[in-house]
Amino acid sequence: MTTQTFDYIIIGAGSAGNVLAARLTEDADVSVLLLEAGGPDYRLDFRTQMPAALAYPLQGRRYNWAYLTEPEPHMNNRRMECGRGKGLGGSSLINGMCYIRGNAMDLEGWSKLKGLENWTYADCLPYYKKAETRDIGGNDYHGDHGPVSVATPKDNNNVLFHAMVEAGVQAGYPRTDDLNGYQQEGFGPMDRTVTKNGRRSSTARGYLDMAKERPNLTIITHAMTNKILFNGKQAIGVEYIQGADKRDLKKVMANKEVLLCAGAIASPQILQRSGVGESTFLKSMDIDVVHDLPGVGENLQDHLEMYLQYKCKQPVSLYPALKWYNQPAIGAEWLFLGKGIGASNQFEAGGFIRSSDEFEWPNIQYHFLPVAINYNGSNAVKEHGFQAHVGSMRSPSRGHIKLKSKDPFEHPSILFNYMSTEQDWQEFRAAIRITREIMHQPALDPYRGEEISPGKQLSTDTQLDDFVRNHAETAYHPSCSCKMGEDDMAVVDHQGRVHGLQGLRVVDASIMPLIITGNLNATTIMMAEKIADQIRERAPLPRSDAPFYVASA
């Protein structure tokens, strides 16, 4: 049987891979193969398509890799969840659909690193806009012709959203009408990646739907990448397994480039399995070294968060929606009308604040939710309630990803090393105390009952630290494990090209040099849009001159 050859092979049909597949195949003379280890994004499966059902995919294995960390030493040795998307759409198929770009100062910080001078906010904003269609139209900060549908909260949504934003303002923090606009600090409405018909706007729906009928795009699902193939230092193809038979290895060849888009956990794992990584470690795993690159799998970062939960004195929360006998009507309204509770992720308000003046831009994020429940759908409080998700944004803690074996089906060793610095503890103590202050503002007086969690009896540093150690959870934002840059631990350059190799790029959240202030999906899509132009050797989009807010010191 002849080996198939394509111009480009993309590994991973996720938030970045689907962008590349769609953009590269706009050139009709270019052939692209898209390999995805998971299955299709079944459009009739409410678990991934209904925004309010976002907890369901995290409870199963069909759409979730369901990684676990090693025992985290500063978190009572808990093995913590690290859910990642599996299937067309990747993590955009199972995420919380919060459309948050981070802060302009994140990108300004990246651009100060050697070699990353073209990653300023002015360089990147045009690519955020290119990807977006916002339901209320475009402006200097937002797009109106992009593949990703973005929905804005409406004034008649749950009263608790408005009360929580108002409470934040009463506590002395700014108000903003657009967390992705001029002022990315303060409390306000939070946009979401949802279509006008109330469906999840994953990159499979947004990008693959416009590209999958093109004759120059081939998509193979249930294709687990074993390794990238090299001729010397040149990436020339990919070896993958389709189905469960590990002996059934298939090879495909790339004329131009292999584009690794498997995410912050799997991309370094695939590189290591392919012989790219720290050479001593690779030899210890009996892997032939193709290229010694010590930064592969290092610099791993994430956001940690916790829930502060309160009883609600008025019957205005979403608690009734958790009752089985109310769910058929909610489901029908969503299915047939694309409206109602089912059409929202229910993260319609939130914000970013600075816990102290030492921070130049916000270091704490809030998501407000008008029901008291864990993100993965567990431990729902059996009465009316509401909660704030709160966590620090730029932890100094660093972790790593390491292979456990050469078996592509074995999950790697993951250690985030959460809460390993004194700054982490200071920020989380401050976050709890600030949240309590916000929750006790007059705007919430009509609604706020007693504090369910952590519970008002916990107030000392030691008590709060114990609560964080035992109850903080991932915000599902792993990143930075194949970082961009030019220092000794950088894995790729400013265009995602792997240092020391030819014909190989990494394009996903793993190449962020530093984690951003907020949810990762919008920025991952932006990065893929930007690098797609570089792969196609197109001129970059004109830089934006839109201003952005920076708090005065």
UniProtKB/Swiss-Prot annotation:
Active site residues per record: 477 (proton acceptor)
Cofactor(s) essential for the protein: FAD
A GO BP entry: glycine betaine biosynthetic process from choline
Alphabetical UniProt keywords: FAD, Flavoprotein, NAD, Oxidoreductase
InterPro entries (UniProt xref): BetA (IPR011533), FAD/NAD-bd_sf (IPR036188), GMC_OxRdtase (IPR012132), GMC_OxRdtase_N (IPR000172), GMC_OxRtase_C (IPR007867)
Positions bound to FAD: 7-36
GO-annotated molecular function: betaine-aldehyde dehydrogenase (NAD+) activity; choline dehydrogenase activity; flavin adenine dinucleotide binding
Top class in the EC scheme: oxidoreductase
The keyword 4Fe-4S is assigned to this record: no
GO CC annotation terms, alphabetical: membrane
Alphabetical list of PANTHER family matching this protein: CHOLINE DEHYDROGENASE, MITOCHONDRIAL (PTHR11552:SF147), GLUCOSE-METHANOL-CHOLINE GMC OXIDOREDUCTASE (PTHR11552)
Family: Belongs to the GMC oxidoreductase family.
Identification of the protein by name: Oxygen-dependent choline dehydrogenase
Organism this protein belongs to: Acinetobacter baylyi (strain ATCC 33305 / BD413 / ADP1)
Species lineage: Bacteria, Pseudomonadati, Pseudomonadota, Gammaproteobacteria, Moraxellales
Encoding gene, per UniProt annotation: betA
